[in-house]
UniProtKB/Swiss-Prot annotation:
PPIases accelerate the folding of proteins. It catalyzes the cis-trans isomerization of proline imidic peptide bonds in oligopeptides. GO terms for molecular function: peptidyl-prolyl cis-trans isomerase activity; RNA binding. Its EC number is 5.2.1.8. It comes from Cryptococcus neoformans var. neoformans serotype D (strain JEC21 / ATCC MYA-565) (Filobasidiella neoformans). InterPro entries: CRIP (IPR035542), Cyclophilin-like_dom_sf (IPR029000), Cyclophilin-type_PPIase_dom (IPR002130), Cyclophilin_PPIL4 (IPR035538), Nucleotide-bd_a/b_plait_sf (IPR012677), RBD_domain_sf (IPR035979), RRM_dom (IPR000504). One of its GO terms (cellular component) is nucleus. Residues 1-169 form the PPIase cyclophilin-type domain. This is Peptidyl-prolyl cis-trans isomerase-like 4. Residues 330-504 are annotated as: Disordered. It is found in: Nucleus. Belongs to the cyclophilin-type PPIase family. PPIL4 subfamily. It is an enzyme of class 5 (isomerase). The lineage of its organism: Eukaryota, Fungi, Dikarya, Basidiomycota, Agaricomycotina.
Length: 504
């Protein structure tokens, strides 16, 4: 006896164990005959495990037996129980892929309603003895593979609905009960969780989209995911960041072109805030590209259209809008974390501003009582030299317009070391060292007197003599032992020769 389930992904032909499980098979066949399973969704799909259906509400808590469903449609007589007792046999196990079982409700005694599942892998012995096996899929294993590969949410529900569109009974060996209801003409889709929007089983998301639009959609998705990744690792302030529209990127420059030359040429389009040619950090040679920041976006647009492929110092330059957000990222980090607490710009961060970190430490030290000592000028120590700002000819070129991974504004390890050396404990130790008494200096000078040096040299000389004499004695002892062994071997040879002569 067989039943065919027509799903949205293909057909499944199931052979039922009518002889071994008559009660379970009759309940399943009669529900199929009443079109109870029509348009039901597979609401629980676990990869390489099971695909569950048979619940009109698609929640896992609905469904009922044949007797309960018939009574709900035409009440007459006493109300039957919602579940029936299935046949759970040890001879029927979940050994092969495509095994059909009734889902047993965790009640006492265990019972089944209308929910069933199909195994998606072999040898799932965990389910043996817990659920009632009553059939096997004999055709349509490729359909099970499609169900197994479906994308699901965190609850196991496929993102695109997989539904049972129609059920065809190939053979029904059981007669209809006396109170059997009339067979409906056209099934109505049950209201299964209308609160969540899902892709319909008949819908193809890419069917009506042209190839160009589908490619554009794919590129936008990849760009959004890449931006989100850069935001997570800290290279972008936020995923939806856009590069500034008033900054131009100029490349293919002549190595002899200077900042002043470009600024003079581009200044006719509007006010220029900065014009910097990026240079090599070691040699100072031009890298043949520059960044020009205008006061207004309209001026940058005019320069973009008018200066494209213009001859500058015998070179055809290329002008485009800058795609770097490094300057924007640094300014946002410094504004959102001015005191240096945590983050990339804080004490232990990877980037940030050294002066801002020192100001934050000074504020905390002022609260704890250390600011007067640290901030007070020291007459014995000259003030530190001012830190020069990087110019267009400095190492690495410009400070404002680097690549996304540019991190030149981060403080060096020497700066962090200087900051640690300015801690109150180290300052206290330095004061103690500077204020130590002259008596200790005199004692140290006395320890280095010529007499003590002569005594120390004499002791070292005696120690070396003793070591040399000990080594000589050891060497002489080794020689004596070698001579004794040689004499013994010589005497042994003489005795052997005398014995041979006597025997002759």
């Amino acid at each position: 006896m067989s039943v065919m389930l027509e799903t949205s992904l293909g057909d499944l032909i199931i052979d039922l164990e009518v002889d071994k499980c008559p009660r379970t098979c009759e309940n399943f066949i009669k529900l199929c005959k009443l079109k109870y399973y029509a348009l039901n969704a597979f609401f629980n799909v676990s990869k390489n495990f099971i695909a569950q259906s048979g619940d009109p509400t698609a929640t896992g808590t609905g469904g009922e037996s044949l007797a309960s469903y018939v009574y709900s449609q035409s009440p007459s007589g006493p109300r039957p129980p919602r579940y029936f007792t299935p046949e759970i046999l040890n001879s029927l196990k979940h050994t092969h892929k495509g095994t059909l079982s009734m889902a047993v409700a965790p009640i006492n005694p265990p019972g089944c309603g209308s929910q069933f599942f199909i195994t998606l892998a072999d040898n799932i012995d965990y389910l043996d003895g817990k659920h009632a096996v009553f059939g096997h899929v004999i055709e349509g294993l490729d359909t099970l593979d499609k169900i197994n590969d479906a994308f699901t949410d965190k609850e196991g529900r496929p993102l695109q609905n997989i539904r049972i569109r129609h059920v065809e009974i190939l053979e029904d060996p059981f007669p209809d009960p006396d109170n059997f209801m009339p067979i409906p003409q056209s099934p109505i889709r049950p209201p299964d969780d209308l609160s969540k929007v899902r892709i319909a089983d008949t819908e193809d998301p890419n069917a009506v989209i042209p190839e160009e639009e589908a490619e554009e959609l794919r590129r936008r998705t990849e760009a959004a995911s890449s931006a989100l990744t850069l935001e997570m690792i800290g290279d972008l302030p936020f995923a939806a960041v856009r590069p500034p529209e008033n900054i131009l990127f100029v490349c293919k420059l002549n190595p002899v072109t200077q900042d002043e030359d470009l600024e003079l040429i581009f200044s006719r389009f509007g006010k220029i805030l900065s014009c910097e040619v990026v240079r090599d950090k070691k040699s100072g040679d031009s890298l043949q590209y520059a960044f020009i920041e205008f006061d207004e976006r309209e001026a940058a647009e005019q320069a973009y259209f008018k200066m494209q492929n213009v001859l500058v110092d015998d070179r055809r330059i290329w002008v485009d809008f800058s795609q770097s957000v490094a300057k924007m990222n640094r300014s946002m980090l410094s504004s959102s974390n001015p005191t240096g607490r945590g983050g990339r710009g804080g004490r232990g961060g990877r980037g940030g501003n050294y002066s801002g970190r020192r100001d934050g430490d000074r504020d905390r030290d002022r609260d704890s009582g250390w600011s007067s000592r640290r901030d007070a000028p020291d007459s014995r120590r000259p003030p530190p030299p001012p830190v020069p700002m990087s110019s267009s000819r400095d190492v690495g070129g410009t400070e404002g317009y680097g690549l996304v991974f540019d991190d030149r504004s981060a403080p060096s390890s020497r700066g962090s070391k200087r900051d640690r050396e300015r801690s109150p404990k180290r300052e206290r130790d330095r004061e103690r060292e500077r204020d130590r008494s002259p008596r200790r200096d005199r004692d140290r000078e006395r320890d280095r007197s010529p007499r003590r040096d002569r005594d120390r040299e004499r002791d070292d000389h005696d120690r070396r003599d003793r070591d040399r004499n000990g080594r000589d004695r050891e060497r002489n002892g080794d020689r004596e032992r070698y001579r004794e062994r040689s004499r013994e071997r010589e005497n042994e040879r003489y005795r052997e020769r005398d014995d041979r002569d006597r025997r002759r």
